[in-house]
């Protein structure tokens, strides 16, 4: 018995020792955690048990030049529910959601779907599911009728976790009924791709997709507010730890004048309908044309865009609440003219005779005599192809100014061909083409830098471009040259033979920069393409003395109190080094276009003494289509202020369709007080060329802008009788009665004729 007690006592002592050791170990570990590693575990505890609730900032407005809003925020009521309260309910909050649905007249399943986390098993597809955080209030219903909200407000105890908040969505007041839809842009929901690398975006937020909404998204969106809360391990709210208020976005004040913008939109739409009607009357099969175009007004010194219209336009209210698939299809439908595309900056057209304002200074640098007259025959011959004047008209002997007034094509063919020949013709290598260089000097072939997204660079087709173009297509054309075309592909035997011959020619010699390329280039045809805004910048440079400016829609950014926080000033990108006499002659020619030349009928009752104008028409002809009409103009007083541009695709001549739209713009600008009347003793801009060149040079030097000039490479006189033939023996033959002037080695499927008014 004594032995048994001794054994039991030993076991008790051993157990006590083990317990003591365990207590000491646990106590030591606890001390380590509480004292030695206190900061580490306190931080871990805080991180694990805190949550952030994001408060969206009010988005800034987009304002007209006078401060009236083009885009504003419209407050409306939104019903939200706290996800934490839902989790505390036995049915996960389903009964609360159903009760809210009954009160606001909504489908319970739709509202319940909005509470389900996107990607979970029972969640509908985005955006009908919840993409917010676990503690972010969930939006159940938006734009609710105030009468339906009364039960929620009067008996909040019946709807635990439910709140009625005032939120904002975009509204478009349309000042003066102006839309400016493509310029303003639109918003859509933030996508997962948008979130990559961005900590300023929220999955439930909106982001600018186009126009000013996209370009100035950072300024407009503001800074979100954040409330940091402590929660228990079970997720229950404990207390608010920290709160940061949201900071409203900045308002973007533009240079847009609503009255001028409205006229630009309406006049474009009206002349588009007239052109379509006239074309259909001429050809009953010609339907659905003249649907695209653009019109603008820009300050020639600052690049400020006073009006920026794109045809066809659309009502921006289509974005309210999001577009459906049918609406989106209409916005991108080519048969409807792709309303979503901003034709001002994203669409390109052959500039046609408006390009002669670049080619004349080039030809002048190659030896033109300002005191001579130059013949303007109906046609000239390059290789075995005739290149004709617009409507095959002959105008006799003309001064350089008169050549611009009547828009003589054949004079430019002659000048550009001689320069091409002086450079080595088709055998030229590593040459500097003055026509190409000055076009690039005016900014063509590069984006203007305007504060709008999705801008096209256009195309200046030099020798390098043609080689690259040929290399990209030669395999297909060489294969066609070998296999030919089947009767099923082209039933007409003559057309089939033409296609096969064209494929053979392109396969073997499509890389050559030929005389046809050169003469097409000189009048803005062939493969030359520009955006409307690019050509406006060209004419602004002519009006201001040579400075190529960067256009701007936005003027400044304002905070909620109206204080200026940012100024969006423009810059001189580069300078065209005009010869004084060259600029004078060019300006005189452009002034004559409006008073005596191709655009004179549209301005026959205009007060030229008080408000002198200068401009150039253009008619770009593309095989198989109606012509694209152009008119670019500027006020031609001592200090030119504005340039206007109008282009209408697939319509007719520039004098018939584009010039009348410009006339409407100038009428409105005069009535709005934007034009300064010329004093009787003040010179025209052509007579003030020297002063403008000096002022432009000083500004360009201050901006550090490069000056672009061209050298005389022709080394032969451009004076004298017109050559009866510009014969190039190794160029292929073609039908001499063919009025087109496209390059004979171009892609046969995209032929363009060289003709302009």
Regions of interest found by a model, annotated:
Residues 1-214, 218, 224-245, 274-294, ...:
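Membrane-proximal periplasmic segments of bacterial cell-envelope enzymes
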Residues 94-102, 142, 150, 154, ...:
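Solvent-exposed, polar/charged alpha-helical surfaces in well-ordered, non-transmembrane soluble domains
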Residues 260, 266-313, 320-321:
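Phosphate-binding glycine-rich loops and their immediate beta-loop-alpha structural context
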């Amino acid at each position: 018995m004594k032995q048994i007690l001794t054994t039991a006592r030993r076991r008790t002592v051993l157990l006590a020792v083990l317990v003591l050791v365990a207590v000491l170990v646990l106590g030591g570990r606890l001390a380590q955690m509480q004292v030695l590693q206190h900061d580490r575990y306190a931080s871990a505890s805080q991180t694990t048990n805190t949550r952030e609730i994001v408060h969206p900032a009010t988005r800034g407005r987009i304002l007209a030049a006078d401060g009236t809003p083009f885009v504003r925020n419209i407050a409306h009521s939104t019903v939200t529910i706290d996800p934490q309260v839902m989790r505390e309910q036995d049915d996960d909050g389903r009964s609360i959601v159903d009760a809210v649905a009954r009160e606001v007249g909504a489908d319970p399943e739709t509202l319940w779907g909005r509470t389900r986390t996107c990607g979970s098993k029972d969640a509908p597809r985005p955006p009908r599911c919840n993409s917010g955080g676990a503690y972010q209030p969930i939006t159940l219903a938006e734009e609710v009728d105030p009468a339906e909200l009364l039960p929620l407000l009067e008996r909040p105890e019946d709807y635990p976790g439910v709140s009625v908040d005032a939120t904002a969505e975009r509204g478009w007041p349309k000042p003066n009924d102006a839309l400016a839809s493509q310029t303003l842009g639109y918003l859509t929901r933030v996508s997962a791709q948008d979130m990559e690398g961005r900590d300023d975006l929220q999955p439930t937020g909106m982001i600018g997709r186009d126009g000013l909404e996209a370009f100035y998204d950072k300024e407009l969106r503001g800074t979100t507010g954040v409330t940091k809360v402590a929660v228990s391990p079970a997720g229950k709210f404990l207390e608010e730890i920290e709160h940061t208020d949201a900071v409203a976005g900045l308002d973007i004040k533009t240079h847009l004048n609503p009255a001028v913008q409205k006229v630009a939109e309406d006049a474009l739409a009206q002349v588009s309908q007239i052109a379509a009607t006239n074309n259909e009357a001429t050809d009953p099969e010609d339907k659905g044309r003249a649907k695209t175009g653009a019109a603008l007004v820009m300050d020639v010194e600052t690049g400020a865009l006073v009006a920026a219209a794109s045809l066809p336009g659309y009502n921006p209210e289509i974005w309210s609440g999001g577009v459906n698939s049918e609406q989106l299809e209409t916005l991108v439908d080519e048969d409807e003219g792709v309303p979503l595309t901003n034709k001002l900056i994203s669409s390109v057209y052959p500039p046609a005779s408006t390009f002669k304002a670049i080619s004349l200074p080039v030809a002048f640098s190659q030896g033109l005599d300002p005191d001579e007259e130059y013949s303007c025959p109906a046609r000239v011959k390059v290789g075995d192809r005739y290149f004709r004047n617009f409507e095959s008209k002959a105008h006799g002997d003309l001064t350089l100014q008169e050549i611009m007034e009547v828009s003589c094509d054949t004079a430019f063919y002659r000048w550009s061909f001689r320069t091409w020949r002086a450079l080595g013709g088709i055998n030229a290598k590593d040459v500097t083409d003055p026509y190409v260089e000055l076009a690039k000097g005016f900014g063509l072939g590069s984006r203007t830098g305007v504060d709008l997204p999705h801008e096209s660079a256009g195309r200046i087709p030099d020798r390098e471009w043609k080689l690259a173009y040929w290399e990209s297509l030669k395999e297909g054309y060489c294969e066609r040259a070998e296999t030919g075309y089947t009767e099923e592909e082209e039933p007409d035997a003559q057309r089939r033979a033409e296609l096969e011959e064209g494929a053979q020619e392109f396969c073997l010699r499509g890389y050559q920069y030929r005389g046809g390329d050169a003469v097409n280039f000189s009048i803005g045809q062939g493969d030359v393409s520009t955006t409307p805004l690019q050509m406006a910048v060209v004419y602004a440079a002519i009006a201001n003395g040579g400075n190529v400016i960067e256009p701007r829609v936005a003027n400044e950014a304002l905070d909620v109190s109206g204080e200026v926080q940012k100024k969006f000033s423009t810059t001189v990108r580069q300078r065209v080094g005009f010869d004084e006499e060259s600029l004078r002659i060019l300006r005189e020619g452009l002034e004559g276009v409006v008073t005596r030349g191709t655009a004179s009928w549209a301005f026959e009752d205009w007060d030229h003494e008080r408000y002198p104008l200068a401009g150039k028409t253009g008619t770009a002809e593309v095989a198989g289509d109606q012509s694209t009409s152009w008119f670019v103009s500027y006020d031609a007083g001592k200090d030119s202020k504005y340039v206007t541009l109008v282009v209408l695709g697939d319509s007719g001549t520039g004098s018939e369709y584009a010039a009348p739209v410009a006339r409407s713009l100038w009428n409105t600008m005069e009535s709005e007080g934007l034009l300064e009347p010329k004093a009787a003793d003040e010179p025209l801009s052509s007579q003030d060329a020297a002063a403008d060149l000096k002022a432009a040079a000083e500004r360009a030097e201050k901006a550090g802008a490069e000056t672009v000039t061209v050298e005389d490479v022709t080394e032969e006189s451009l004076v004298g009788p017109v050559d009866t033939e510009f014969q190039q023996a190794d160029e292929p033959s073609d039908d001499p009665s063919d009025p087109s002037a496209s390059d004979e080695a171009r892609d046969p499927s995209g032929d363009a004729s060289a003709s302009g008014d």
